[in-house]
Amino acid sequence: MLDELRAEKNFPSKPYDSLKNKSEFDRVYQRGFKKHNSFFSLFVLDASKEPSHFKNPFFCRLKDTEKSCLLGLSVSKKVGNAVKRNLIKRRLRSLVLKHASLCQGFALVFVPKKDCERLDFLTLEKHFLEMLISIKGYMNKKEKGTNHTYAKP
């Protein structure tokens, strides 16, 4: 009977891992693509294209195939009190859970702005998807351009 009350042991784990330290955040800030709107900033780094050195934290963390995304949340005290900051973090985590297939292979850092606290979940989701799709489109366009070779005159 006690086993019936417990949660299932094979409950799926979250499809993302979090960025752990300053060096990981700095790598996304410096090498990643930035996109801003009036509610938050999103920094995206294609972690699958990072060099696979042994000491590279992205390579070590993404070799587990179940953890296909790295997520970092940087919510400052300017956004609101602790309750509001935690609400924003919960919403952003659930967005990454809900749209895990779009985030696959990326390291994401969200930096919410003060106006983000007044958004409801559906509006936040709309802005998140618009930003992520535009970033992926830009990265694909940029990738196609760099792989093109030209004949020498």
Swiss-Prot record:
Keywords: Endonuclease, Hydrolase, Nuclease, RNA-binding, tRNA processing. Transmembrane segments: none annotated. GO terms for cellular component: ribonuclease P complex. It catalyses: Endonucleolytic cleavage of RNA, removing 5'-extranucleotides from tRNA precursor. It comes from the Bacteria. GO terms for molecular function: 3'-tRNA processing endoribonuclease activity; ribonuclease P activity; tRNA binding. HAMAP family: RNase_P. RNaseP catalyzes the removal of the 5'-leader sequence from pre-tRNA to produce the mature 5'-terminus. It can also cleave other RNA substrates such as 4.5S RNA. The protein component plays an auxiliary but essential role in vivo by binding to the 5'-leader sequence and broadening the substrate specificity of the ribozyme. This is Ribonuclease P protein component. The lineage of its organism: Bacteria, Pseudomonadati, Campylobacterota, Epsilonproteobacteria, Campylobacterales.
